[in-house]
Every structure is written in C-alpha cells, then in structure tokens.
Amino acid sequence: MLRFVVRSVLLMTVVMACRLADAQIDTVAADPVGAAPGFKAVSEKELNAAAGRLRESLGPLRQLLDRSKSGAGWREYLDWKELERQAASGTKADVETLVRLYRKFDSGENGLEMPQFSAVKRAVGSYLEAAGTAGNPDAEKVYKGRLERLAAAVKEAAASGTPQSLEVVGPTLARLEESGQAPQVVARLRKALGMPNLLLQVDEDLVGRSVNRVVDETAPINEMLLGARVCGTGHTTGLVLLDFQPSADRAVVDLVLTATNHSQTRGTKGPVTVHTLGTATVDARKRVFIDEKAVTSAPVDVNASVATKTQGISVNKKLGAKLIRKIASKKIAQMQPQARAISEQRARQRVRSQFESQTAEPIRKAASDYQTKFRQKLLERGWFPEMLSINSDADRIFVTARKSLPDQVAAFTTAPEVAPAAVLSARLHQSFFNNLAEQELAGRTLTKEELESQMEKAGRKMPESLESEADQPPWSITFAKRKPVELAVSDGTVKLTVRGSRYTSGDREFDAMDVWATYKVESDAGKFRLVRDGDVQIYPPDFVPGGDRKLSVQQTSLRGILQKRFNKVFDEVIDIKPLELPGELKSAGPLPMEQLVARKDGWIVAGWRQAEAPKSETASLAAVEP
C-alpha cells in the first residue's frame, strides 16, 4: 500500500507550490542589461578553464564509446585524437580545428543527441567561443552587438507579453558566459528569464481515495502475561489514512493507523481465572520522504494506551474460594499498572513490527523505481530538469521544475493559478516542451522503421496516422537544428509546428518544409476540446502564403505528400476525455477536466477535478489487544 502512495506521488509527480522566484521579466524590462561593463579580454585563466571543461566532458563519452560496439567508428568520425589534443591545448587552441570538430558534433548524425555527445558538443562550443573571442580583433564590436540584441529582445517580450522575441536570448547569454563577458548581466537575465517552466500538484484527497481504508477485524488472543495464560478475542476498528505533512525542502507523506481494540479475555493462573474487558488505542505513523534525489523513510513511530476493567474473578477450587478470590482481587489491583505497561509495550512492538514488515518491501521497491525508472532514466537521456524541487503542505504535494540548457531560456512570468476544484494539475510553459524537443530532435533523422522499433520497445502500437499506406513508400524526416518541434501558446490557442530540413519518400528526397496546425481551446457544458483552426499549413521556411514567391514543382509535390499524412496526424477536433489514472490510482479516476487555459505568455494550465467517490473498502489489520 505504501509503495502505491509513493508511486502515486511520483506519477503525478514531483514542488514547491508556488514559492516561485520573485524575478520575472518586469523586473528587467525598463533596462535589460543595466550598467553593463565594458568588453574584457579573455584571460589565459578563462581559456585554461574552457579547455579543462572539455577534458572533463570527454570522460563520460570515452566510457560510452569503450563499451559500445560502434565505439571505434565514432572515434574515427569525431577525430578523437585531435579532440584530445585540443582539450590539452589550454591557451593555444586552434580555432579552425575547433570549428571543424564542432561541426562533426552538430552534423545531426543519429546518436549525437545522446547526453554524452551533447555535453562534449557544448564544451567544444564553449572553448571555441572563448578562443575565438581571444583572437578576434572585432570582439568588442561583437560584444556590444550582443548586448544590444539582448536589450531589444527583452524589451519586445516585456511589451508584448509573449516569448517569441526571446529566441535569441538563450544563445546570446551562453556566448557571453563562454567568453567571460558581463557576468552580472548574464546572471540578472538568467534569473528573470529562467523561472520554473513545469509545475505539478496533486491533492491528498485524490491519492487518499485509493489509499484510505477502514480497519475492522476480529482476531483471537492467546499470550502469557505475568505468568498467566490470557485467552479471548479482540475486535479492532479504525482507519488507515494518508496524511501529507508541511515541508519546504522535500515532500513528507505519512501513512497513519488510528485504531481502537476492544477485547474480552480470561486470564488463568492456578485455580484463579480473571475475566477482563480491555480497550487499547493505537496511533502508528510511517513517514516517507521524497526529494529530487531519492525516496527514504523513518522508522515507524507508535503510541499506544491500554485501559482494563475486571469483569469478574472465578476460582476453580471450593475449599477457601472466598479467601483466594479476595487475595486475587488485591493482587490484581497491585499488578494492574505493571500489566498495563507490559500490554502497552507489547502493543507498540506488535504494531511497529507489523507496520515495518508491511512497508519495508514497498518502500524499497518505490525507492528503487524512483532511481531506475525516473531519475536514472531521465539522466541517461539528458532529460533530467536543471532544477527540480519537491515539497508538500498539509493538503498537496508540489513539483517545480525548470528544463533549460545554458543556451536556452525558460518561463519569464509566473504560472496562472490552478482552479480551486482541481485535485490534479499540470502547468506547462511552452519553453519546457520546446527546450526538450530541441535537445532530443535537433538535426536528427527519424525513419518509419526507427519509429516502429521505438514504439515496439515501449510496448505501443504505431499510430495509424504515421503508417505508410499500401501505395506509399516508407518515409523519413530530418528535423531542423533550431526549433525542430515547437509549441507556441497564445490566449485561447495552441500552435504546434514541425520543422523538417529534409524529407524522403522511398527514393525521392525533398528539401525543407514546415508543417503546423493551430487549435482553439473550447469548452461547453464543462467539457473541453481542441478545434483545429483551418487546414494544416505546409510551407517552406520563411515562405509567406499569398506573397510574390511561388512554390516549385518539387515543393508542391512534397506539400501534397505531407498534407495527406499530417491531416491525419492533426485531427480536426480533439475531445478531451476524462483522465484515466495508472496503477493503483485507477480506482480514483477517471478524472473529469476542470480547467484548460492557454495564455499568450506561453503557459498552459490543465486541471482535473475529483471523480465520484467509490464505494468504501475494508482493509484488515491484525488485532491490537491489551
């Protein structure tokens, strides 16, 4: 059960609800670069540091190539020996050689999107920028131009309230940082334009509906107490409840047992049998911690109290029975505090042992899954957020994340509020999606066969919209290096663009083409849907429909092929169905959508309300007897 709690939290995931950074674009709009310092020549120390970062980045890639069957081929392709020579060059880097090496990493060959390759690519680029700036007589002019572009882009974004003009900001900040220029300006703008771009929250009520249980069990009692054999029955009633705890630096989840055991026993020692009514109350708590690194737990904490009432004393002996009963009654009164203390201690030990045994394996499994299925998997693919914070209050668990590499920006405004009735919500800024898409797809070639293989590994079927028809040959797409797949959010609309720098259909090759569709967010009688605004648009990059420029015969042919396929990919109407929940959470769903908001600053907010309450279930727990 506890494993379910932890997994549920992770599935909905991982946040500081809403203790967001104070910085946002309004704080820098009036004077984006401030009193920027003058140009500073790149020092030997900075060149050596850039070379050191390149050497450091080679380690993980070297390990990857050592264990890869294609490692030798990659080393030859990347000119590994020259790469190592340049990494050891310090202040004597060869700019032309670094340019050549960088182009190899930026060629779009499949596999180069892996994080080990990407890290070296960034390190080569950083070293190249530092060395190029050091040897460029026009470096000061370039520096001033960058500051001007930054100021113009930030002012435009602040004035329009949209992120479109910020496209140049991420790469420009990265180049300034790599060449050691204007560190205060870089830090200031990174803070303003690097706010969290993914916020998730889940209510205790939602998870609790699949966790909370009624305890109702009758069990036999048979034990020794102060030399007497005690037998009888105990009836335990109570609740097992999920209880979120306030915590600023991690999520804290308690699984709490609150129960009362009413027992009726007879204790026999020699000729005397004592009939007793007992009441034991128990409060047990198993605490689990979840942060960005691991799932851990504390030992079970148990409180127990016992009260007894002697119902009667019988003596299995006629001779002297009255005297024996009198002595026994006095002895019982004297021993009652000791008996109560022993009973309370046994109750604590019993419940502690039981709770630990019930939760040990689920917690171990949850901790293992957190590492292997969440953290490690994201790290291996380079998807782990650059900032991830998990925390809780008395009612919710929050996950706050920011995904943005050094040459990318994130959100520049705070996220919209979540609807009060939402028990599960996700607030996604377009930068989260776009940054991840660029990291994963930029320059990559995807074939139908490769997509089929990936879908099969994931245990999914190929979407019909991406299947080649009987009369159509296999296809491939090479994604653009910049914004290969882009999400653009405006007030009440969502636009998705796919940019291909090259397409193939069988043996035929086609040049670059952009494909996009715009959807309106509509709601009616509490139901939400996305309605496509017109046809799917397919044009070459920078082509203006209705302008003087005309499509070539080849472009018209490709447009027809893509139109046929993408009209199936981008449905005219997408009805938002109630959300089916995974695993043990399934019984708490499906959740009807409560909120779907698209805002021009790039934010999408989706919230789901509680489903109708399921019938109560009963769980058993061994009786806690005095």
At which residue positions do the language-model features occur?
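Short acidic, glycine/tyrosine-flanked loop/strand segments centered on an H-E-D-like triad
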Residues: 298-332
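Bacterial N-terminal signal peptides
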Residues: 8-17
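N-terminal beta-strand/beta-hairpin edge segment
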Residues: 240-242, 246-296, 468, 473-475, ...
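Interfacial loop/beta elements and low-complexity acidic/Ser/Thr-rich segments
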Residues: 187-252
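Short beta-strand/helix segments in adaptor/scaffold domains that form protein-protein interfaces
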Residues: 227-228, 232-241, 245, 293, ...
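Extended, low-charge, aliphatic-rich alpha-helical segments
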Residues: 25-211, 326-533, 540-626
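Bacterial N-terminal signal peptides that target proteins for export
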Residues: 1-9
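Sec/Tat signal peptide C-region and signal peptidase I cleavage site
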Residues: 19-23
